[in-house]
């Protein structure tokens, strides 16, 4: 038994997760009635979601309170990359929809309890109100905009505190980080359970009716991950981006794919940034911010499904309208974390550009929920892995400029 344990400890986390995925698929196909097994995945995701707000608050307030005047954090470039990357993803989705026009079979049942925002202004109003949320409520509800804003305020206030107080804050951040390490080490079991749940509840053939839609959505996201993002990276760093891109996809995207939660993946991303050797002053702010506004995958989902609706209803669309759609999708996607239902519930905002009624747009949303098992997984994997990628290339570019 000890030999098996020692062998397990020596195996890398990624290989353990791979083993967990295989076992989860086999159990889902061969023993779908083991419903009690699903609780392990819920506990794993619940643990990550529970610790993530505390981790963000502790790290951000600690980093800002210890920050020396004039220290470089590269946040301006990172925020630009987040916004530009989201817009580029939206533009690629428009081009994909032109090359591979989709039509949808509607009359899909829709959850009537969901209420989409009435426009981009409402999305941003919601985000602004989250800035001034009660700090305790922000932590309890995982409102990362609120957590970030209060962590920054507390960090600035703590700059004038005694060294003993700052040391206490630093210790709290280290303790929280250690708890995160313990939870992440349970990823193979948690992901095995999540894979089992997906296979046992949905089967392997339930999505065959929507195969082309899934292919277009996933293909666009893969193109952005393996072509567009590396192109952005090479323009910034002037070096081969693929080792970093593939590492981000492997160590961040894989976990995000199965948890389907950018919030739950924040601790994973922070640990990866630490392993890469990035500055804590930077990634403690950029990673939770990225989980909120870096939404390339969401922009792809909004545009592909909106243009599928446009093709379904035979609505003509010119280049300028498509460009405007990309802007609206990018802006809306940045607010996806502030909307219940995420990117899918922002589709009516984009559909309104073409005069598509809310009732019809919500039927498109219904189609989105049907393919959501795969769409949401790929979307989260792209969004979350890009948070680390853009943080890393911004810091890399800074050091190259400094050496020049």
From Swiss-Prot:
A GO term from the CC aspect: plasma membrane
Coiled coil: none
Chain segments annotated as transmembrane: 17-37, 39-59, 75-95, 138-158, 179-199, 212-232, 287-307, 313-333
Chief place of localization: membrane
Membrane topology: Multi-pass membrane protein
Membrane among keywords: yes
Family: Belongs to the dicarboxylate/amino acid:cation symporter (DAACS) (TC 2.A.23) family.
This protein's name: Serine/threonine transporter SstT
Protein's organism: Streptococcus pyogenes serotype M5 (strain Manfredo)
Gene that this sequence comes from: sstT
């Amino acid at each position: 038994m000890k030999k098996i344990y020692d062998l397990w400890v020596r195996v890398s986390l990624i290989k353990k997760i791979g083993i967990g995925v295989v076992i989860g698929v086999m159990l889902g196909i061969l023993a779908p009635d083991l419903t009690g097994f699903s609780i392990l995945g819920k506990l794993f995701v619940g643990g990550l979601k529970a610790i993530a707000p505390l981790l963000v608050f502790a790290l951000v307030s600690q980093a800002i309170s210890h920050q020396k005047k004039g220290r470089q954090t590269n946040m301006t470039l990172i925020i630009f990359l987040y916004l530009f990357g989201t817009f580029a993803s939206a533009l690629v989705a428009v081009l994909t929809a032109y090359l591979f026009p989709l039509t949808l079979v509607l009359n899909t049942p829709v959850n009537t309890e969901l209420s989409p925002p009435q426009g981009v202004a409402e999305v941003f109003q919601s985000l602004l109100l989250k800035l001034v949320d009660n700090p305790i409520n922000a932590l309890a509800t995982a409102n990362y905009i609120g957590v970030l804003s209060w962590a920054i305020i507390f960090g600035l206030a703590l700059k004038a505190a005694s060294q003993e107080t700052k040391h206490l804050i630093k210790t709290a951040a280290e303790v929280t980080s250690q708890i995160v390490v313990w939870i992440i080490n349970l990823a193979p079991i948690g992901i095995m359970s999540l894979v089992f749940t997906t296979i046992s509840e949905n089967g392997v053939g339930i999505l065959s009716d929507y195969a082309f839609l899934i292919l277009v959505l996933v293909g666009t996201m893969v193109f952005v991950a393996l072509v567009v993002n590396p192109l952005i990276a090479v323009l910034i760093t002037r070096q081969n981006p693929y080792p970093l891109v593939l590492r981000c996809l492997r160590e961040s995207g894989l976990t995000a794919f199965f948890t389907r939660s950018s919030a739950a993946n924040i601790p994973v991303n922070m640990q990866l940034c630490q392993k890469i050797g990035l500055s804590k002053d930077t990634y403690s702010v950029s990673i939770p911010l990225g989980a909120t506004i870096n939404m390339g995958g969401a922009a792809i989902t909004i545009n592909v499904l909106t243009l599928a609706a446009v093709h379904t209803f035979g609505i003509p669309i010119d280049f300028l309208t498509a460009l405007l759609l990309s802007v609206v999708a990018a802006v809306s996607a940045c607010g996806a974390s502030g909307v219940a239902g995420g990117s899918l519930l922002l589709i009516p905002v984009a559909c309104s550009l073409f005069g598509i009624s809310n009732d019809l747009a919500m039927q498109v949303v219904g189609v989105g929920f049907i393919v959501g098992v795969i769409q949401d997984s790929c979307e989260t994997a792209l969004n979350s892995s890009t948070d680390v990628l853009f943080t890393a290339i911004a810091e890399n570019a800074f050091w190259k400029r400094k050496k020049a």
